[in-house]
A protein has these predicted regions:
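Beta-hairpin "wing" of winged helix-turn-helix
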Residues: 83-93, 100
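N-terminal leader segment of winged-helix/HTH proteins
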Residues: 1-42
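Hydrophobic patch in the ABC ATPase nucleotide-binding domain
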Residues: 28, 87, 119
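Alpha-helical residues within the helix-turn-helix
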Residues: 66, 77, 83-84
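Conserved segment of winged-helix/HTH DNA-binding domains
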Residues: 100-119
């Protein structure tokens, strides 16, 4: 068998019971679209570095900018995208704005990703 075909079925049998069972449990298309958009947020090195820092503790914009060697303007743009994706939240205390991860789900997804690449 040629290598190109080694990873495909060599038959035309359809396991209808499996197909029907999975089809019945499959979420609607909008859920897949939303999930793909969520994962797009993790597809940018800068945003991943921001999320990593915030997975350690909440930080103000100035500290994040220094840590990541970014301008506050560039950082604010990325934080806005993360905020719109509900990955981070902020708390204004006077003139200082602190950012943190929105919830433990975000940290879990992030840490699972690191576990996966380390295997």
């Amino acid at each position: 068998m040629p290598k190109a075909e080694a990873f495909t079925c060599d038959c035309d049998v359809i396991h209808e019971d499996v197909v029907n069972r999975i089809r019945a449990a499959m979420p609607e298309s909008q859920s897949f679209y939303a999930l793909a958009n969520l994962y797009k947020m993790f597809a940018d090195n800068t945003r991943v570095r921001i999320l990593w820092a915030l997975s350690r503790e909440k930080m103000c914009v100035c500290d994040l900018a220094v840590l990541l060697n970014m301008t506050k303007s560039a950082l604010s743009h990325q934080l806005k995208l993360l905020r719109l994706a509900n990955l981070v939240t902020y708390d204004r205390q006077g003139k200082i704005v602190y950012y943190s991860l929105s919830d433990d789900h975000v940290k879990d997804v992030f840490e699972r990703g690191f576990e996966h690449i380390r295997e």
